[in-house]
Amino acid sequence: MRDPVRTLIAGCVLLVGVTACTGGSTATEPVLNVYNWSDYVAPGVIDDFEREYGIKVNYDVFDSNEVLETKMLMGHSNFDVVVPSGPFLQRQITAGVYRKLDKSLLPNLKYADQEVARESAVYNPGNEYGVDYMWITSGPGYNVARIRERMPDAPVDSLRMIFDPQVVAKFADCGVAILDTPTEMLGAVLMYLGRNPNSESLADLKAAESALMAIRPYIRYVHSSRYIDDLANGEICLAMGWSGDVKQAHDRALEAGRGIELAYHIPREGAIRNFDLVAIPADAPHLKNAHLFINFLLRPDIAARNSNVLKYANGDDPSFEHLNSAVSGDPGIYPPLPVRAKLVPELAKTSQFTRLLNRMWTRFKTGE
């Protein structure tokens, strides 16, 4: 989710595995191995942690929960800190992937937004295994001028922008992208169809596949991070993306002086709301360092720095006073209560349904 990190990755970027850089680990060495989403930490945050604690951070990135889950279920990843989304954390807790947090080592939990913690506890009973990092929505992000040229009355605040074939077809020539996240996109298309976004009904799955196949000819690609730069560069004009990613793309376009205006709306039908949490794998080699890092992320000034750059709402209550007004006052990041009431948390799926969903998603991606 979510590339400042491309320009600041601390330590060595891992291509094969963390051990390729660490050469073996011990619990006492000043090392921390982090596996996080791309585009998901503000510039300087990792450097500041390294300077403050004298700990070398090896930082690797992924761009889908499915990639993270594969590594976690295999075990022996050598990662100390990972950032799964709520439903995946929930399922992986059941599989014994994570260890309970030692809250005595996390004094900054006192800053946690209790409302956010209550909402994310559906994935994380008692908030024992994960700490809220960011919460996000997904919806249409678009190039204002190009959309207006092709459809002056485009329903820019609606899921119709993506899932109505008669609408999305108008933008195929300027490029449309969609997130490569089968569970979240299933929820979004079911919401568009007026169905339960967390349904595991086979009838709903078939209806969702029909709706997705109807728009497939108009989708240029399916990817969870490429669209950020492509929106900023004008390579595409519409993406079903994460709120903060679209806003990061907007900032990049402004910084580059390209004259590209991008916008994001939480769909009026509602949106999938997801929580990303920081967790510690059961076999993490550097437990103390992992807790130090999580506690560092919970500092209000650090949480605000991340939100100010990433354009996502964080789970840290006092950080609000440190936020830029452009972030704290943006309804696409911190929506008003009536909009927030329409946000639906994505729930974990059974393994049997997940297999069916993944097969359907493969058919959608390949167009077959």
Predicted segments — roles?
Residues F88-R91, L238-G259:
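A ligand-binding cleft/hinge motif common to bilobed small-molecule-binding domains
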Residues G141-R146, M191-G194, N274-H286, R305:
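A bilobed periplasmic-binding-protein/Venus flytrap-type ligand-binding module shared by bacterial periplasmic
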Residues M1-V31:
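Short, low-complexity disordered leader/linker segments with a strong preference
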Residues G24-A95:
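Early extracytoplasmic/lumenal segment of secretory-pathway proteins
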Residues P281-K342:
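Mature extracytoplasmic/periplasmic domains
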Residues L205-A214, R220, R258-A282:
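Periplasmic-binding protein-like
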Residues D229, L337-E368:
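Conserved C-terminal helix/tail region of periplasmic/extracytoplasmic solute-binding proteins
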Residues V83-Y218, S225-A232:
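Extracytoplasmic ligand-binding site segments that recognize negatively charged/polar headgroups
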